[in-house]
Amino acid sequence: MIDRLRQQVSVCELCNLHKTRVNPVFDKGNSNAILMICGMVPAHDENMQGVPFVGRAGKLLDKILVAAGLTYDDVYITNLVKCFVAAGQSLEKHWVESCRPYLTKQINIIKPHVIITLGADSSRSLCDLAGNMPMKNMRGRILHYSRNTMIVPTYHPSYLLRKGGVKSEQYIEVLEDFNLAKKCLKEMIKMATYT
């Protein structure tokens, strides 16, 4: 099922981003994972390789995963938007809406218990949060996506890079959020065994 969806994304022309992409960026990690990570948009390196989180932000995400005691076998990684958006370009609502059915299908196929959303845009989109609530007010909480899936919003690694990377205050907060996601995951697994 996930391979069929990946193929659909590879030929997608629902918005104008397909004209400037080199490769659509679909996923990375374990498609059987119960922990999903959802970023925002592919950057240049991701566009070139067709894989999410392979650039500088990806290298920082690697460090975050290690610090949180996770590997790529533990997580499934995707983005809100599947095609390259140039640095500094504002995320347009119709791009998100064009990709939303793909992300929804990914979530329905993977069936994660917890989704860690990286960045304000992916957090707002998946949590249906309106307005401009800052990430500092979203993070550190568990939000409901569906009956069987929770969301833990946190900062995007690219934001951390602008704030000083692993030396930033926000890096510690991201680790707290990843640990919150792991704790939530354990609770959901425990609840599932009793139902």
Show where each model-derived region lies:
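A polyanion-binding, active-site-adjacent surface
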Residues: 1-195
